[in-house]
């Protein structure tokens, strides 16, 4: 649904992007994941990506974080809490897996819309503040251009200027830069394994949150 990505589509976009990494970068990502999941082995998947999670996933891979970010959490730290500490997030993952199956099973527009609406109802039952997050602000959308002939540099500056309305480009930039900072902190000398793991986990959370909004930028219904 290119008008607005749903959880399984966010997850699929993340999955495809990571599957296309070079072998060296994929190995590096796997190594980061292994360090970050220390202590959370029962909740987080053994591999950073799970291509076929089935209809009832019992663990969350990194690709799923892009679906959870933004729609089922309000910040990277909130997302981490939901991913690692809540029971309902696994219900959400199962609903998303069923939605992915339902969307793949038909090209009929009405049936696809019904599948999405049914999943929204089920998401709301599992995640009680699901609809509240969606209606809180316009953060998932692109900032409207001041003028039709606004050039790219002026537009991006407007998106990132202090006081600008919340917007997808601003959110992506903020959390991507934060992820880079935290990844850098994880490599500082003198850190214990627990401290390094915490920095890497936080960096992965920030990047997944950033990626959710990067994906939203390319949803047709999110363009002002």
Each PLM stretch: what is its role?
Residues 204, 208-214:
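Aromatic-lined, polymer-binding surfaces characteristic
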